[in-house]
């Protein structure tokens, strides 16, 4: 493959992740504040709107994956859905009705749910074909999200009204859509029968077990984004400190994503997944004990270890254990379990625990889930050593 073309494709992929996450990072973290401050919605109304995203993703992410596998037009689908996501975001400015906000939130989540799994599918396939580093591309997403959260907080606090987050978000997502049209395409393969492909995945015991690992290990890290500010506030952190710690946590993912492939090459996929799960478990156990603020400051980088290593390793593992012709479906099912159902469950259950017990008890729930994920990862590691004890379909692509 021509070196110049490869460099252009890598630049397009990095640019897409950067601007796509700049877009979503501009809107999602401050959406609840916009609905509360400018639209004067109640807490329960805001909670309902914010909970729609994960629920919608549960259903739509597998749909987009199956559509991608069937049409084999992944990058076109990605470009269209990314631009539509940004345009839908503008509707929050145009309307001021709670029922319409519910509709807008559902539509926004439906199209936004394509961004991560389809771009990951393209990036994983291309880095494998060119012996590249997926983590070196994906880190631009963490960079974009971290910069967006920090910058939008400053912009809306000092310069402009909060509704500008939708204008910036739309602009960034439209730029990402243009870049999506420049990413590498995929080679044509035999079109998959959607029902047959889905049955193939749900009959894959290894895949199903790993979906549970994703639910128990990765989902608490996502739900932590909802409760971390409450945890910090209860621990005595100021508002400015909370913003800085959020930023440091997101940015800390970058170096670990950058060197994740080095860890994977030396340790193996499941060992890296177990390492990230162990770090998550340690973090939740620490937070459950209501530590001093200086300990929280000193350990915030653990988010980078837990998420920065898990994402590249988990995606490559899903790709490894599933046939190529249902790859996009598998990745979107993985996203639906982690970003969708798992995130929703941990956030929903955590809300009840926070209301009736304490914010620190929320991290006990996260810790219990992480213990289960750690144990299942050990099970898969043993099963890999004794492959005859665990049935899995033949993989139809070269690793």
From Swiss-Prot:
Residues 36-42, 102-105, 158-160, 231-234, 290-292, 356-358 are extracellular. Its main location: membrane. The chain crosses the membrane at residues 9-35, 43-71, 76-101, 106-123, 135-157, 161-180, 211-230, 235-259, 270-289, 293-315, 328-355, 359-379. It comes from the Bacteria. One of its GO terms (molecular function) is cytidine transmembrane transporter activity. It is found in: Cell membrane. GO terms for cellular component: plasma membrane. SUPFAM superfamilies: MFS general substrate transporter. Belongs to the major facilitator superfamily. This is Uncharacterized transporter YwbF. It comes from Bacillus subtilis (strain 168). The gene is ywbF.
């Amino acid at each position: 493959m021509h070196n110049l073309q490869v460099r252009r494709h890598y630049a397009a992929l990095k640019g897409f992740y950067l601007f796509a996450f700049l877009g979503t990072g501009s809107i999602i973290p401050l959406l609840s504040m916009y609905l509360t401050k400018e639209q004067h919605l109640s807490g329960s109304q805001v909670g309902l709107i914010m909970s729609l995203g994960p629920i919608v993703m549960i259903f739509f992410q597998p749909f987009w994956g199956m559509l991608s596998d069937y049409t084999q037009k992944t990058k076109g689908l990605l470009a269209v859905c990314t631009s539509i996501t940004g345009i839908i975001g503008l509707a929050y400015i145009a309307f001021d009705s709670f029922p319409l906000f519910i509709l807008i939130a559902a539509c926004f989540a439906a199209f936004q749910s394509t961004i991560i799994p389809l771009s990951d599918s393209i990036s994983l396939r291309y880095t494998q074909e060119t012996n590249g580093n997926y983590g070196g591309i994906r880190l631009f997403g963490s960079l974009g999200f971290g910069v967006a959260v920090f910058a939008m907080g400053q912009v809306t606090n000092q310069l402009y009204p909060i509704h500008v987050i939708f204008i910036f978000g739309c602009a960034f997502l439209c730029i990402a859509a243009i870049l999506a049209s420049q990413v590498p395409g995929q080679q044509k393969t035999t079109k998959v029968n959607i029902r047959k492909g889905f049955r193939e995945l749900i009959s894959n015991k290894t895949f199903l077990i790993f979906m549970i690992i994703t639910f128990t290990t990765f989902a608490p890290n996502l739900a932590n984004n909802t409760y971390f500010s409450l945890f910090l506030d209860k621990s005595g952190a100021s508002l400015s400190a909370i913003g800085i710690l959020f930023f440091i946590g997101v940015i800390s993912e970058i170096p670990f994503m950058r060197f994740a492939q080095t860890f994977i090459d030396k340790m193996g996929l499941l060992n890296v997944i177990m390492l990230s799960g162990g770090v998550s478990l340690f973090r939740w156990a620490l937070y459950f004990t209501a530590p001093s603020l200086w300990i929280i400051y000193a350990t915030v980088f653990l988010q980078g270890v837990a998420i920065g290593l898990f994402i590249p390793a988990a995606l490559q593992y899903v790709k490894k254990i599933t046939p190529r012709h249902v790859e996009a479906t598998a990745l979107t099912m993985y996203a639906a379990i982690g970003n969708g159902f798992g995130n929703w469950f941990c956030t929903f259950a955590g809300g009840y625990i926070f209301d009736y017990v304490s914010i620190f008890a929320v991290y006990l729930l996260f810790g219990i889930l992480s213990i289960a994920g750690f144990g299942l990862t050990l099970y898969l590691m043993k099963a890999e050593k004794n492959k005859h004890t665990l049935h899995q379909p033949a993989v139809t692509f070269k690793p």
